[in-house]
Amino acid sequence: IHDSCVTRDETSHHESVRWVLDELGYNWTEIERNGKNTRCCGVGGMVCSSNPELYERVYTRRANDFDQHNIVTYCGSCRGTMQAAGKDAVHILDLLFGPKYTKDQERARGYQTEQEMWKKRLETKERLNHLW
């Protein structure tokens, strides 16, 4: 489980995600840097846009904290960075609302860079502004 840095002090979030995984029947392991000690995935402060080289170093370091290939997170940006680092990252909502997931069937998801995701968000906002 990768805990998002913005929830570093939100112990109830950490506990809730782990409870959901337990209730869904998934086996998971803790890593050393989690919860209050979690590391940023690299997206914080829009580093991905302002300093791509630093972004790559930060997300690679974070991904290397995991011995496992499969990572569960509850932040869309964190999921994207873990995928960029070559991990099979799954958002908790995919597990809640999707089919049962096993580590031997890595999902074929289209990977988008952070810049692509932000561009789509901006385009969606502009479309919605025209409606309202």
Language model regions located:
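Iron-sulfur cluster-binding electron-transfer modules in prokaryotic oxidoreductases
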Residues: 1-132
